[in-house]
Structure formats: structure tokens, C-alpha cells
């Protein structure tokens, strides 16, 4: 159903409402020429404007209505008359005021003009009769109405009086508009504000619109001036006033539509109005004075349409397919679509969402069809789509291409998506997710829009934001992993040293030292009783004893040498074993390094090839293990030789030599007499006693000896703290590198979101209306949760005893900003300090960290967790009015998502939204969503199914599509379309969105005026 002849709704048209006719005094040309001028005019609406007269308008209308006119005049005239029938004519009366004012430039006697624009539905005779009653020098115009010179030069009227009379006359009330020239001939700009400011303001306040083509002047009347407040403008003008302009043509040779400058020379400007070409359409600019008027060469939206014809649906046809056999009518419609905003309205079950689904299908949406509400299995596509298959949609795009599909078809996910579709069920699902975290659909949708703002070149061939971020952070994550392995190695050494720094360990060493001291004391108590060498012996006995003693001395020296050599060999054996193991470890590391280099070659091969480079010319790695292998071989050979020397089974080994030596000593001792034997036994016992005493005393290098324990205690007092500090410093520096890499990942996020951030920063609608901000930061993610779930038990004594994990770290972490490495590491140190000391007491008693750990958890694991910084995450978060996305209500999420789809999304493809207001309150729609929609429709086709008057009417939808289903007529779905100002559409709006006029009036009567 087409409402009159403008089903596409409000579109941009050229209007010239200041065109004089031969009825104006001084006009150059006759009516035949005038009709030719009108018919060939480059404009759609023409206001025939004469001084205190509509005679010219009436004559042209007569000619259009006269059938005989089709045969009159020449061919040019007849052709122009036919063209003129497609245009709209408005009756306009130009009046002069009685007021004579002092010009602000010092000129006196200035006359002020104003225009009365009448509804063409009014009979011209009624307008003429009203004009003839105007008084001139005490008598009405009457019979002098045909005297154009008299009307031009002699008639002046009181502005307030004539407006008052028209408003009081039921025939004219709401059927005329007052147009007041401003900065043009007869305009009020010349009024001196020093003497007649009040008059000037009153004239402006009483005018419906002003005459000016100056953008600065137009902006002023739209209250767009930084010097003045909205309150000041409201006091001056009452409401915002539209500015329009006409050609002020007085000559049939003028080009109508084209505006003139102050020297009456033609310019490249036209007066464009986006409305039905009717009086009601003109009235609409009073309610939308900014968005429905453009004075210039061409409105930006028309340029947008020309440049993006592939991204606009021009028309949609839904018809029965050729093989259809269903008796039901369902669809038989042809819907021209507006390029701006289309609002689809209708009662429940009327076919609103059906049209949205069909549009989405025709545009190959990539939205999951399961979210459709009409083209689904349990509705129109039931029984394997048998019914849907009998109907087809044909979409005509503005570039001339067409898309035809059966309604049982499914969108092709591999094809080009030509429309963005947001069904009601999908929007509701995304907005009501219970855990809208980083992996939620809500976040995923936002990331898609953000990715659209990254230039094709900067996407590096990646298809999603996550892919691009992963690519750009891969090496940084590798650096973090390597650093964490290094941290773990340092922690292994550090925990070993810290275990020695405890009071328990010191006490254990002190106890071992005391035990050795007692052992040495006890050993001294059992020293051999001294036996003197026999002195009263004969010369022969003495000679025999001396010979045996000499041999015994030699054997004992041999025994001492064997013992000393055995000790040396065992030390060397131990050293060689350690060196062999070290060589093997180094060889393993070299092999690992070689494997890493090989992996680097594999991973960079394709990239280097694209750059025309070779890895070998950038990095040269030469691995030669020959010296290491030779060294390990020599060490192994030496150890094998020493193993043989120390092996008791070999005849020439040291143990075998010692056994033989002891046998010889025993044999020599058997040759001595009793006194000398006792003396030798004493010497042997004394040697063994001294040997054991030396073993007990030991040396600082021997750990389990008296001097070894003394050295360990000395190390605990002096050397150990320095070694611990050294490892802690080393660990801190590595942790700083980890933090540096995390910060670098954060900066990658920042670069990814820079384009969106710039858009948000530059958008007044987003910045002020939504208070939408991006924040780049490093955040602590679930530190307390992991710390107390995996590592620390709050059920034992200590600083965290009986504390809830959610609050346990609050008093510690609040003072630290983890965005800096120093403060992040200070935070960790404070946590460790709370584990090392019981902060619940004034004494802050020392505590063992190990005693506070969960079962099967060691201190090293805790250190790896704390110093690995795995709980620090780079985040580039979006916040709405200071709130993180995870804390937004479903309504706030819906608003934000729609803002992203509408305003932030760079795509110019049509966007179809099914009932976005379902999760939004009316105030949110009015304050936040409407400014966004009005801004976006300037550059993108928006199609919305809605039952909200705020969206359809306050957003000033250019086209309203009313859906209705006639069940009695075979389920015929009927779509009626047109502009808001269309009378039929206006009635639908009131009935459907407001619940009928009486319901609306009832509500309005009960509201208090603010």
C-alpha cells in the first residue's frame, strides 16, 4: 500500500518558496513564460509568492486543472505544464509591516517584510477573501486587490494583528506559517538592538521560521553558539528556529531553486528540505529545524548514497514463487526503502519481525539464523520450510544489483555480509549473560567492532582482533615464559639458602657443633696411656729393636702416605664426577640452544622469505662441542683410573697396599719382646687416636666436623645474608623484565584500540552522553583467589589467619599501583613480609612461610607464583560512566552494544535492529540512544523494528513502515509506508505506539509540566 505518492518517506528535495509571479508588480514575463519557468525548474516544491496576493498562485493552479490547457500554447509550454504536475505548489503571501524603524547602521525609514505560507489544501478564494479584508488608510483592500502596484507600494499591515487574526480564524488556524526574513531585503537583521531589541525578539519569537542562507546565522537560531547558554536562547526565542531561503525570483529568465548572494547573483546553493513535499512536510521542519534543512550544493547524505550505492537497500519485493500452491496470501509487497532511518511498527504478531528477518536474509547476514524470530522452524519455516519455500524475496540495491532468495534459504556464512542484523533474541542473550567476561559474546561483539577500526594494512592479514593481538604479543609472551623459568631456577637456590636462615636450622647446626665438641672431649678422655720406651736392654737387644723400629717407622710412613693419598684421591674422584656431570649439563644446554635456533629458523622462514632475507645472514650460530667432548672424555678417563686406584679388589690399589702394609707392621710387631711390643702398641694406638681426633676436628671445608660446623655458623652470621640478598636482587631484576613485557603487551592493546579511542574522544555524543572511556592499565586478576586456593592456608596462624580470601589482601594492595614495576614488586614483598611475620601482633612475631602452606605445596612453588606475575594482566578496558563492562546492568550493556554497532562500527552496511528497546528503559532510549541514532543515520541506513515512540518519532525516522496481518484474507501481510508527516502514517503512529489518541491525551493530561 503506497501512502499517496511518497511511500519512501522523507527524502531530500529542493524547495524554492520565494518565487514571484506576473501578479507581482515589476515582474518580467507573462504567465505562459512563467509556467515554462516553473515546469523546468530544478526544484520539487515551489512557493508562488506575491505581495498581498495569491493571484499568481491561483492562476497557475487554474491552468493545471484546466483540461483545455493541454492543447494551449506551444510545445514548450505544454511540456512544462506536464512537468509542473509532478511538482508541488504552495501559496505564499509577502507582506510589509506598518513599522518604520531606525536601521542599526543609521538609515531611517526601513520597511520590514514577512511571508505567510499557506496550506495548499486551503481554497485560494478563502485566502484572497482574507487578504481583501486588510485595512489600508481606514478602508479594506477590496476591489484594489488586482492592482499589483498598489499592493506593492501602499499596503502595510500590523504584524501582530494579522497573525492574531489568522490564529483566531478556525479556517486558517494551524494551516499557515510565518516566515520572517532576517539578513536579506526587508529582513529584521537591520533593527537597531539599542532602540528596538524587544520588538526584534518578539518578531523572532512569533515567527515559525527565518530567512537566511548564512550558516553562522542558522546555527545561532539553532542555539549553537559558544557564547550563550541554552537558557538565554530559550528566553530570547522560545524554541529553536529553522532558517530557509528562496531565490526571490522576479524574472522568468531566473533559474529557480538556485539561491542568490547579497548582490542578487546566483550561487551554487539550494534550499534542501527533507520532508514530504507538502505543507505538513514543511511544518515538520519546525520540530526538526537542524536535521531536516540543508542549504548548500548537496546534502552530505545524498553524497553518501552516491558513494556507497552497494551498501544501500533501495527496494524490497516479497512475492509468491512461481511454483507456490499454498492458498494463503502471506506476502505480495513492494517496499521502497529510505536511505536514512526506517522504523517498522505494528501490533504484536503483525509481521514487523518478519520483515526484519527477510531483510537480513536478503542481505546475507552472518547472524546465527537460530536467533531469527519469524524465519525459524517453529514458525514460518516449519515442516522443513515447505511454506517458506513458496515465497521469495528480491532485494534491489542502490547500485542496480539484485538478490533473490527463497524464504527457506539460509544465510551463507562464507559469502559477503551486506547487512548487519541484531535480532531481539540475540540482543537479549548478549545483554543478560551471567558472566560477561573476556570470553563472553558481549565482549566478542565489542572486539569485532573495535577490529573494524584497524586499517587493513595494520591488520597484518589477520581476521580477528584476538588473532592480531596474539600475533603481536607472541614474542613478548615467549620472553615472559623464559623469564619465569629463570625465576624458578633462582627460587630453587634461594629457598635452599633461606632454609638455612631460619632459627631452626641454626639451632640444628649449633646442636651438631655441641655434639662434635662433646665427641672431641670424650675422645680426649680416652687418650692412650703413655708407655715409655724400654731403656735397660743389652746392646744386642737394642740393635735388634732399632732395626725393627726402623722398619716399623718406614711401614708407618708408608701407611700414612697411603692414607693421605687415599684422601686426596677420593677428593679428586668427587671433583671429577662433578666436572663430568657439569660437562654433560653444559652439552645439554648447548643442544637445547641449537634446537631453539633451529626452531627460530622454522618459525621465521616464511616471514624472512617475504622480506627477502636469510636468517643465516642475520644471526650466525656455530656449535663446536669437540673441545667439550674431549674434556669430558679426559675427565672420564682420569676418573676411571682413580676408581681403579681406590678399588679394593685390584692388587695395586690403595686399599690393597694399605692391607699389605698393615700385615707387615703386624709381623714386625710380633718380633719385638714384651716391653718393646707394648711401646710399639702405644705408638700405634696414639697414631690412631690422633687420626680420629683430627677427623672429629676436621676443617672448615668438611661439613660434618667440628671446624666445619663452626664455619657454617660463621657463614650463617655473615655470608648467608649477603648471598640471599644477591639472589633476591637477581630475582627482582628478572621480575622487572617480566613486568616490562606485560606493559609492552598493554601497549599493544593500546595501539590496537587507538582508532576507537580517537573516535570516542572526538564524539560529543559518546563522551558526554555516555561518559564512555578507554583505560589502559595493568590489573591484578584473581591474585587472592589463587593465592589462598592453591598455596596459603588461612586455617593456621599468621597474618592471614581466618581471613576471607576476598578481603585478605585488601589492606595490603590498596596502596600500590601495579602499573609500575617498582610498586608491583613492593606489593609482592609486602605479601611475603606478611607471611614471614605475624602482623596481627604488635611484636610482629617471625613466622615460617612453610608452616602456612597448604598440603603438598612448597615455598618454591609459592615464590614461582608470586614472582612470576601471572596474576598481572595487561588490560585496555572500556568503561561506561566509570563502570567496568562486567559490572554493567543488562540495559547498560544493551545500550553500549548498540552504540558500538551504530556509532563506533566503521561499516557502512545497513544495520537492522529488532526492538532494541526491550532491555532499555525509556529514559535511556531518549537520553542516550536517540542522539546516537540521529547521528548515525546521516551516513548509514538504519532499519529498526520498534514499539517505542521515542525511537520512531523522537528519532524522526524518515520512513515509517506499518505492518498489519489480515487473518481473514489468507494471512495477508500488509505494509503501509510513508513519512511521519503523512496523515495516514501519523494515525498509525498514534494508534500503535501511543495506544490511540484518547490514551495519549489521557496520559498527557495527567503529567505535570516541568
Where are each of the predicted segments found?
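Charged catalytic cores and adjacent phosphate/nucleic-acid-binding surfaces used
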Residues: 1-45, 54-91, 95-124, 185-349, ...
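Phosphate-binding glycine-rich loops of NTP-binding sites
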Residues: 46-49, 58, 118-121, 341-375, ...
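Flexible phosphate/Mg2+-sensing switch loops adjacent to catalytic phosphate-binding sites
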Residues: 75, 363-408, 742-759, 764, ...
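Conserved ABC ATPase signature
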Residues: 336-340, 344-353, 423, 876-900, ...
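C-terminal lobe/lid and adjacent interdomain/linker elements of RecA-like ASCE P-loop ATPase modules
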Residues: 386-388, 405-406, 414-417, 926-1010
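Extended, charged alpha-helical "arm/stalk" segments used for dimerization and assembly
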Residues: 407-495
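Extended, charged coiled-coil "arm/hinge" scaffolds of SMC/Rad50-like chromosome-maintenance ATPases
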Residues: 489-492, 496, 518-887, 893, ...
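Loop/turn-to-beta-strand initiation segments
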Residues: 875, 907-910, 938-943
Amino acid at each position: 500500500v503506497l501512502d499517496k505518492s511518497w511511500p519512501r518517506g522523507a527524502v531530500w528535495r529542493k524547495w524554492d518558496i520565494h518565487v514571484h509571479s506576473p501578479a507581482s508588480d515589476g515582474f518580467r514575463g507573462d504567465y505562459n513564460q512563467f509556467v515554462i519557468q516553473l515546469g523546468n525548474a530544478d526544484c520539487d516544491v515551489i512557493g508562488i509568492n506575491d505581495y498581498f496576493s495569491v493571484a499568481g498562485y491561483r492562476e497557475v493552479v487554474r491552468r493545471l486543472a484546466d483540461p483545455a490547457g493541454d492543447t494551449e500554447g506551444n510545445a514548450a509550454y505544454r511540456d512544462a505544464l506536464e512537468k509542473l504536475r509532478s511538482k508541488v505548489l504552495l501559496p505564499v503571501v509577502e507582506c510589509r509591516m506598518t513599522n518604520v524603524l531606525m536601521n542599526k547602521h543609521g538609515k531611517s525609514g526601513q520597511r520590514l517584510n514577512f511571508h505567510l505560507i499557506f496550506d495548499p489544501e486551503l481554497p485560494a478564494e478563502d485566502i484572497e477573501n482574507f487578504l481583501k479584508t486588510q485595512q489600508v488608510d481606514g478602508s479594506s483592500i477590496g476591489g484594489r486587490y488586482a492592482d499589483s502596484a498598489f499592493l506593492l507600494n501602499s499596503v502595510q499591515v500590523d504584524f501582530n494583528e494579522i497573525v492574531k487574526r489568522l490564529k483566531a480564524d478556525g479556517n486558517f488556524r494551524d494551516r499557515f506559517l510565518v516566515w520572517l526574513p532576517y539578513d536579506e531585503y526587508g529582513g529584521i537583521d537591520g533593527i537597531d538592538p539599542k532602540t528596538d531589541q524587544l520588538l526584534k525578539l518578539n518578531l523572532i519569537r512569533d515567527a515559525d521560521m527565518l530567512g537566511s542562507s548564512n550558516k553562522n546565522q542558522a546555527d545561532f537560531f539553532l542555539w549553537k553558539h559558544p557564547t550563550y547558554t541554552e537558557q538565554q536562547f530559550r528566553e530570547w526565542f522560545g524554541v529553536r528556529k529553522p532558517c530557509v531561503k528562496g531565490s526571490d525570483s522576479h524574472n522568468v529568465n531566473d533559474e529557480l531553486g538556485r539561491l542568490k548572494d547579497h548582490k542578487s547573483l546566483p550561487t551554487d546553493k539550494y534550499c534542501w528540505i527533507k520532508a514530504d513535499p507538502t505543507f505538513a512536510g514543511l511544518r515538520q521542519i519546525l520540530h526538526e529545524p537542524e536535521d531536516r534543512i540543508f542549504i548548500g550544493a548537496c546534502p552530505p547524505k545524498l553524497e553518501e548514497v552516491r558513494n556507497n550505492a552497494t551498501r544501500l537497500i533501495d527496494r524490497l519485493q516479497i512475492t509468491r514463487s512461481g511454483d507456490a500452491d499454498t492458498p494463503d496470501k502471506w506476502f505480495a509487497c513492494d517496499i521502497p526503502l529510505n536511505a536514512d532511518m526506517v522504523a517498522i511498527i505494528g501490533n504484536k504478531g503483525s509481521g514487523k519481525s518478519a520483515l526484519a528477518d527477510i531483510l537480513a536474509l536478503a542481505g546475507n547476514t552472518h547472524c546465527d539464523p537460530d536467533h531469527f524470530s519469524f524465519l525459524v522452524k517453529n514458525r514460518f519455516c516449519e515442516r522443513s520450510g515447505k511454506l517458506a519455500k513458496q515465497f521469495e524475496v528480491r532485494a534491489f540495491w542502490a547500485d542496480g544489483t539484485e538478490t533473490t532468495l527463497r524464504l527457506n534459504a539460509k544465510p551463507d556464512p562464507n559469502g559477503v555480509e551486506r547487512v548487519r542484523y541484531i535480532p531481539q533474541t540475540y540482543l537479549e542473550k548478549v545483554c543478560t549473560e551471567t558472566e560477561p567476561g573476556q570470553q563472553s559474546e558481549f565482549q566478542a561483539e565489542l572486539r569485532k567492532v573495535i577490529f573494524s577500526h584497524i586499517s587493513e594494512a595494520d591488520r597484518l592479514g589477520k581476521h580477528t582482533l584476538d588473532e592480531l593481538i596474539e600475533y603481536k604479543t607472541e614474542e613478548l609472551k615467549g620472553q615472559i615464559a623464559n623469564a619465569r623459568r629463570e625465576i624458578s631456577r633462582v627460587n630453587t637456590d634461594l629457598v635452599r639458602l633461606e632454609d638455612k636462615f631460619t632459627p631452626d636450622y641454626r639451632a640444628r647446626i649449633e646442636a651438631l657443633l655441641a655434639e662434635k665438641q662433646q665427641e672431641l672431649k670424650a675422645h680426649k678422655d680416652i687418650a692412650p696411656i703413655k708407655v715409655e720406651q724400654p731403656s735397660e736392654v743389652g746392646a744386642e737387644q737394642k740393635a735388634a729393636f732399632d732395626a725393627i723400629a726402623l722398619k716399623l717407622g718406614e711401614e708407618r710412613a708408608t701407611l700414612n702416605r697411603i692414607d693421605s693419598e687415599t684422601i686426596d684421591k677420593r677428593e679428586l674422584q668427587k671433583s671429577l664426577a662433578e666436572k663430568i656431570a657439569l660437562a654433560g649439563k653444559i652439552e645439554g644446554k648447548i643442544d637445547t640452544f641449537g634446537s631453539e635456533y633451529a626452531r627460530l629458523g622454522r618459525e621465521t622462514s616464511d616471514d624472512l622469505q617475504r622480506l627477502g632475507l636469510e636468517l643465516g645472514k642475520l644471526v650466525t650460530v656455530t656449535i663446536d662441542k669437540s673441545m667439550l667432548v674431549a674434556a669430558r672424555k679426559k675427565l672420564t678417563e682420569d676418573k676411571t683410573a682413580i676408581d681403579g686406584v681406590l678399588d679394593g679388589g685390584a692388587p695395586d690399589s690403595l686399599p690393597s697396599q694399605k692391607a699389605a702394609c698393615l700385615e707387615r707392621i703386624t709381623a714386625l710387631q710380633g718380633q719385638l719382646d714384651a716391653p718393646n711390643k707394648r711401646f710399639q702398641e702405644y705408638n700405634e694406638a696414639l697414631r690412631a687416636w690422633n687420626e680420629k681426633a683430627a677427623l672429629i676436628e676436621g676443617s672448615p671445608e668438611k661439613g660434618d666436623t667440628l671446624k666445619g660446623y663452626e664455619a657454617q655458623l660463621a657463614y650463617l652470621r655473615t655470608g648467608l645474608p649477603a648471598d640471599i640478598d644477591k639472589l633476591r636482587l637477581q630475582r627482582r631484576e628478572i621480575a622487572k623484565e617480566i613486568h616490562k613485557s606485560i606493559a609492552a603487551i598493554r601497549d599493544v592493546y593500546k595501539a590496537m584500540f587507538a582508532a576507537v579511542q580517537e573516535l570516542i574522544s572526538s564524539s560529543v555524543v559518546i563522551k558526554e552522553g555516555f561518559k564512555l572511556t578507554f583505560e589502559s592499565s595493568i590489573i591484578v586478576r584473581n591474585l587472592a583467589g589463587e593465592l589462598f586456593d592453591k598455596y596459603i592456608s588461612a586455617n593456621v596462624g599468621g597474618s592471614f589467619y581466618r581471613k576471607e580470601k576476598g578481603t585478605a589482601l585488601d589492606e595490603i594492595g590498596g596502596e600500590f599501583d601495579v602499573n609500575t614495576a617498582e610498586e608491583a614488586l613492593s606489593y609482592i614483598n609486602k605479601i611475603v613480609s606478611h607471611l614471614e611475620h605475624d602482623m596481627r601482633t604488635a611484636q610482629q612475631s617471625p613466622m615460617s612461610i612453610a608452616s602456612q602452606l597448604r598440603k603438598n605445596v612448597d615455598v618454591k612453588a609459592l615464590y614461582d607464583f608470586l614472582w612470576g606475575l601471572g596474576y598481572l594482566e595487561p588490560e585496555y578496558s572500556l568503561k561506561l560512566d566509570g563502570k567496568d563492562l562486567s559490572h554493567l546492568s543488562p540495559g547498560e550493556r544493551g545500550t553500549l552494544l548498540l552504540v558500538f554497532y551504530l556509532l563506533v562500527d566503521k561499516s557502512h552496511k545497513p544495520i537492522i535492529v529488532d526492538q532494541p528497546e526491550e532491555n532499555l528503559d525509556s529514559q535511556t532510549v531518549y537520553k542516550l540512544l536517540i542522539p546516537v541514532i540521529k547521528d548515525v543515520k546521516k551516513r548509514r541506513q538504519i532499519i529498526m523494528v520498534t514499539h517505542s515512540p521515542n525511537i520512531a518519532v523522537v528519532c524522526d525516522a524518515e520512513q515509517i513502515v506499518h505492518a498489519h496481518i489480515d487473518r481473514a484474507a489468507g494471512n495477508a501481510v500488509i505494509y503501509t509506508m510513508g513519512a511521519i508527516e503523512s496523515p495516514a502514517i501519523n494515525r498509525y503512529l498514534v494508534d500503535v505506539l501511543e495506544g490511540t489518541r484518547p490514551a495519549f491525551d489521557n496520559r498527557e493530561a495527567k503529567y505535570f509540566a516541568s
